[in-house]
Every structure is written in C-alpha cells, then in structure tokens.
Amino acid sequence: MSIFIGGAWPYANGSLHLGHIASLLPGDILARYYRAKGENVLYVSGSDCNGTPIAIRAKQEGVTAKDIADQYHEEFERCFRSLGFTYDCYTRTDSEHHHETVQNVFLRLLEEGHIYKKTVEQAYCETCTQFLPDRYVEGICPHCHEAARGDQCDACSAILDPLDLLEKKCKLCGSTPSVQETEHFYFALHTFQEQIKTAVENVKQTGTWRDNAIQLTERYVKEGLQDRAVSRDLPIGVPIPVEGYEDKKIYVWIEAVTGYYSASKHWAEKTGEDDQEFWDSEAKTYYVHGKDNIPFHSVIWPAVLLGIGEGAIPRHIVSNEYLTVEKRKLSTSKNWAVWVPDILERYDPDSIRYFLTVNAPENRDTDFSWREFLYSHNSELLGAYGNFVNRTLKFIEKYYGGIVPKGSIDVELKDKVEGLYKHVGEAIEQTKFKVALESIFDAVRFANKYFDEKQPWKQREDNPVSCEETIYNCVYLIANFVNLLEPFLPFSSERIRNTLSIVNRNWEPQHTLPSRIDSVQPLFERIDVKQIEHEVEKLYGAVK
C-alpha cells in the first residue's frame, strides 16, 4: 500500500513552539508505524518561505526576506531532526523546484478553465504606496467581532477578504487603507461544490477526518463555496506565469498547499523513484496540521487536486485543536510560548514526544504545564517504563553476568502482546494516537506488576528455574515494548535496541530474544522539581 503523509509547512518567520509540534508530531508517528509494517511511505513537509509574515519581519529588521527564511529554515531542520522527525523530503517554498511545480499547477488549472481573470477592489495603503496583501491588513472580524487578519479569523475560522474587515488598518504603518481597483486571477471554487460535498459525506461515514474538519467543511459547503483570488500583489512568492502579470504572485493559500505536490516531485527527482502511486485514488493519504489550516486542506487542496486530475484527495485529515500554555492561549507576540530550540537544550526529546501525545489536543484544546510535564516524565517514562526496563536488565547484569537466561514465553503474555500489536496498530491508523500510547503504558504497568508478583529476587534463592522463566519473559516484554513504542519514543527505543542488540524492526511480535545485554544505563534521568520551578519563573518573566 502507498502511504502519503503531508505535514503542514511552518512559516519561516520565527522559532517553532510546542503548539507547532503538537499538531505535526502525528505525522512522524504515522510514518514510523507504516514503515515498520513494510508499507511504501512518502512523508514530506517544508518551510513556508514565501508568506507575508516573512516579508513583514524582514522589513521590520531591515534585512531581506531570504535572510529571515534561511535563518529559520535551518533552525526548523535542526529542531525536527532533534525531535526525531523522519521526513523523506523536507524542502522550502522559495526553491526553484517549488516555483516551477506551482507554476505548472497554476497553468494546468488555467488551461482547464478553473482559473479566470477578474477586476476587483483591493486595499491600498497611501502611506506605503502599495496594494496590501491579505496579511498586511488587520481589523475586526465581521462575523465574531474578534481581532482578525485579512485572510482568516483565528477565533471563528472564517475565511475572509481584507475588505470584509471592520476597522481596517495597514499592518506596516497603522494607517487606514483606501480601496482601489486591480486585476487578479480567481480560482473557480464554486464549480467543485458538489464534489467537496460528496467528499465530506463520505468521510462522515468512514470517520477518517477529525470532527472539527468535518463540521467546518460542512459549514463552508452549506454557505456555498466562494471563488477565491489566486493572485496577489506580494513582495515575495511565486510569480504568475502569464505574460504581463509576472509582477503578481500566486497567492499563498494555493501555493503553500501545492508544496506537498512539489516536495513529492522533488523527492522523486532526487531518488529516481516514481511518486505517481502516491497521487492516485488508491493511495492512503494523511494530512497533519492544526485546526487553523482546515479549510486549506479540506476544501482548497482537494479542489486543486480535482482540477489537475489527481485522484488522491485527502483521505485522512488530522487536524488537532490548539495547545495552551499554563492555561493561557499561546501568544508568540507576547512571548507566551515554550520554544522548541529552548526546551530541546535541557530535556529528552522522548519526554517531549510522550507529553505531546498523551496530552494531544486531538478533539479539544489541551494544556502544556511544566508541572504536568515533570509528572509525565518522572511518573510514566522514568517511574513505569524506565523502572521496568532497568530493574530487569540490572537483574540480568548482576545475577546472570549479562547473559539472558533461557526460558519459554508465557502463553498469557504472548496473547497479550499479540493483541497489543493489533489494537495499537488499529488506533494509529485511525489517528487515535493517545489511545494507542496509553494502551502500551497500560501494558507497561502490567509488566511491573508481573515483576513484583513473581518476585525474582526470592525466586533466585527458592526456585532458580522459575526465576529464569520470569526474567526471560520480562525480556520478551521489553523487546516488544521497544517495537511498539518506536513510533512514539524512538530515542529510548534505540537505546534499548543497542543494549539488547535487537535488529528486527518489523511491526510484529518479537519471539526471538537476545542472548546477552551490553552496558546497562538508566533509560531516563529524574527531573528535579526545582528545575521545573525555574522554568515556570522563566516563562512568566519573559512575557512582553
């Protein structure tokens, strides 16, 4: 089976925060799981280097947009690598390859009659002497009356036009923009109304889109899909490939989602592989992002794919809700965030991955609390999983000289492990990552109980053969926990693999066990509560 996984493209205008990772981490879990199953996986993403936020930041700092994009693209790559993300292709939207691919898609849509020209009114700043792209205009949402940008309201998820806003202001200088006529290209989104409606009806039956994606898309369909501008007067971006319009740029909402397609084509060129299997109707596709990106993946991207004749419209939409920080809405402008480069300096990446999975905002907003982070690490990773692994391996090191004793697999444990692979696999495929990880840790707690009830420290004196059986079965459980937890906790899984010399990485019960162990080290270190108190003080002290 061909599995395509697309992770949303973060804007390269500032550091990643935990909210980004909370929405993107499911993509890596899926990719690792499906590879272990032996499926053909293509997992792509990249940095959005063409967005208006980058141009705004560059202007504020007196540098070029490329300077900003280069800085954060490189930082993103380091962060994703440090967190264990296994992208097959992580690229950027200001690359020549991306520009060519997007222009080809634009021309195909134009040739098929899905794009047309239209004279429209647009916000114009007399002070800055320029037309204002959507994100250069800020004001009040006409629907919910919250602060909003000219392209979308984060509060109510309404897709907006800058002229819809109340109390409009130029983001660059703060003046009230005027309205002038200009010519732009438009995407005939209304012509895909019935196809999008059918797609939503289908996923309601299969349950393969998150509820928030279904509900929001149903709302758009009910209101009637509106044609959207596909060009803008932007300072940076992909030029319109039509004579006389080269100064205009392809609008980011269609250009950025086409990044999945361009990254796929880039991967194919780089590897010599054929990527077409990931774009036909038989492919299993997952799009992983936050709820603010829903309309771009549930309406616009499917319409683009239908418009260019590709069959692989999103089968799974994994649209997480928001992550708050210490019960407050995350705010980058106020520096109310936990920044990824910062947290990676001091904490195990598996601790971050574990917390953001068991506390994932899958169906509702969830909160990152430093105290809860401490608890999840010390109680679950260290106290449950690390404890079981270390007590078993230390016992072997101390009493068997590092040689794993002979034994036979307990039938009850064997059935439990085989059932766990099936249950966890199904949960991952259904994008229920929290359920999957909690099921494994239920088994970890069972394993600790098994060790305690068998009391191998007594068996060693009273019944050495039973002791060997107990320890053998504990190693059996560890070997399988390593495989089951690989998609979630790749770093600790790798450490145990090295200790036990486990080679098999397939998603299947491990019945062949290692014969010896090498240099047992603690799987996790305890986090001191004083360190967490310092983190909380630092967070509150950094607020602008």
From Swiss-Prot:
Motif position, 'KMSKS' region: 329-333
Residues annotated for Zn(2+) binding in this entry: 141, 144, 153, 156
Assigned keywords, A-Z: Aminoacyl-tRNA synthetase, ATP-binding, Cytoplasm, Ligase, Metal-binding, Nucleotide-binding, Protein biosynthesis, Zinc
A GO term from the CC aspect: cytosol
Cofactor(s), by name: Zn(2+)
EC class name: ligase
Short name of any one Pfam family annotated for the protein: tRNA-synt_1g
Protein localization: Cytoplasm
Record field: catalytic activity: tRNA(Met) + L-methionine + ATP = L-methionyl-tRNA(Met) + AMP + diphosphate
Signal peptide bounds: none
One term of GO molecular function: metal ion binding
Known EC number: 6.1.1.10
Primary location: cytoplasm
GO biological process: methionyl-tRNA aminoacylation
InterPro entries hit by this protein: aa-tRNA-synth_I_CS, Anticodon_Met, M/V/L/I-tRNA-synth_anticd-bd, Met-tRNA_ligase_1, Met-tRNA_synth, Methionyl/Leucyl_tRNA_Synth, MetRS_core, MetRS_Zn
Cofactor note: Binds 1 zinc ion per subunit.
Function, as annotated: Is required not only for elongation of protein synthesis but also for the initiation of all mRNA translation through initiator tRNA(fMet) aminoacylation.
Subunit description: Monomer.
Family stated for the protein in its record: Belongs to the class-I aminoacyl-tRNA synthetase family. MetG type 1 subfamily.
Full protein name: Methionine--tRNA ligase
Organism: Bacillus cereus (strain AH187)
Gene name tied to this protein: metG
